[in-house]
Amino acid sequence: MDKFWWHAAWGLCLLPLSLAHEQIDLNITCRYAGVFHVEKNGRYSISRTEAADLCQAFNSTLPTMDQMVMALSKGFETCRYGFIEGHVVIPRIQPNAICAANHTGVYILTSNTSHYDTYCFNASAPLEEDCTSVTDLPNSFEGPVTITIVNRDGTRYSKKGEYRTHQEDIDASNTTDDDVSSGSSSEKSTSGGYVFHTYLPTIHSTADQDDPYFIGSTMATRDQDSSMDPRGNSLTVTDGSKLTEHSSGNQDSGLNSTSRPGGKPRVPEWLIVLASLLALALILAVCIAVNSRRRCGQKKKLVINSGNGKVEDRKPSELNGEASKSQEMVHLVNKEPSETPDQFMTADETRNLQNVDMKIGV
């Protein structure tokens, strides 16, 4: 009996987990020239093989580049990477720093990650915008998974079934990649860091190596005026920003300018020469000021020694006897501001200015 309750408890614990694995939410957008975007469970969780199966379940196929460009010209844009035939792309009409690296047009990503959203193409859809609710997954087959279709207007339709034909996609149903960005509040996604990797050859390596090649075009000039980007990793056909301003309803607020941030502005050569001349003039002015101060800073000092001068400056007495001599010496000195000993220039102007009493004796 205890063993029965033990197994029952384990079954109740595992039941929510099994139910979680059997729930799939598919968020879809309006159709533009038959092309629409599908997001699974609010995150990047669709492999390339599952993308083909999912489009097949919607009675659709992966769109080609031409079909994606046509949808773009009708106003279709998102901020989510998704599979098309042979590429992973974002269609952009309005530039945004967090969407397609601020590019416009069909932005093509080359990356080594494996899970994204997907784009699908329904050939029977109207050529213009079509936002009617999708209520069925016509080509799904029997299965235990609860599949819920979430339309842009919020309506939801659920059914039991399965659309995946590859076992590895079923086994890896919980494997997801990090999100790149969110296009609008209606797209259930979380913003996060993402590094773009380019595999195209470049002549000069640059600091921003997050630029896969880029195609922006209109239907009229799609096959003309192809040119290579100066950095070697962008292919521009025409400017996708010339397309109609009408979009799929998920345009972002606070859009940035279409111009890409370039390198640092170069300093004009004439400004460098002018700065050098000013610096040289300043150095010369300082040198002249210091030299003038040294010349004008000389001081003349008059020193009068009364009675006791230096020994070498004294004159030996020519007088005999006990008479003492007193000498006054006047020294005219050039006082230099340096710390060297004072040098004196001595001039004796008076000698023996005394009355000598002589004793006359025999």
UniProtKB/Swiss-Prot annotation:
PTM per Swiss-Prot/TrEMBL: Phosphorylated; activation of PKC results in the dephosphorylation of Ser-326 (constitutive phosphorylation site), and the phosphorylation of Ser-292. N-glycosylated.
Role according to the record: Cell-surface receptor that plays a role in cell-cell interactions, as well as cell adhesion and migration, helping them to sense and respond to changes in the tissue microenvironment. Participates thereby in a wide variety of cellular functions including the activation, recirculation and homing of T-lymphocytes, hematopoiesis, inflammation and response to bacterial infection.
Disulfide bonds: C30-C131, C55-C120, C79-C99
Residues involved in hyaluronan binding: R43, R80, Y81, Y107
CDD domains: Link_domain_CD44_like (cd03516)
Stem: annotated span: 226-269
Subunit structure: Interacts with PKN2. Interacts with TIAM1 and TIAM2. Interacts with HA, as well as other glycosaminoglycans, collagen, laminin, and fibronectin via its N-terminal segment. Interacts with UNC119. Interacts with PDPN (via extracellular domain); this interaction is required for PDPN-mediated directional migration and regulation of lamellipodia extension/stabilization during cell spreading and migration. Interacts with RDX, EZR and MSN. Interacts with EGFR. Interacts with CD74; this complex is essential for the MIF-induced signaling cascade that results in B cell survival.
Membrane topology: Single-pass type I membrane protein
Chain intervals with Basic and acidic residues compositional bias: 158-169
Subcellular localization(s) per the UniProt record: Cell membrane; Cell projection, Microvillus; Secreted
Region (Required for interaction with EZR, MSN and RDX and for co-localization to microvilli): 293-311
Annotated region described as Disordered, given as residue ranges: 158-190, 211-263, 307-327
Protein's UniProt name: CD44 antigen
Domain comment as written in the entry: The lectin-like LINK domain is responsible for hyaluronan binding.
Annotated signal peptide: 1-22
One Gene Ontology molecular-function label: cytokine receptor activity
InterPro entries: C-type_lectin-like/link_sf, CD44_antigen, CD44_antigen-like, CTDL_fold, Link_dom
Residue ranges crossing the lipid bilayer per the database entry: 270-290
UniProt feature, compositional bias: Low complexity: 181-190
Annotated glycan sites: N27, N59, N102, N112, N122, N174, S182, N256
Cytoplasmic domain ranges by topology: 291-362
Compositionally biased region (Polar residues): 233-260
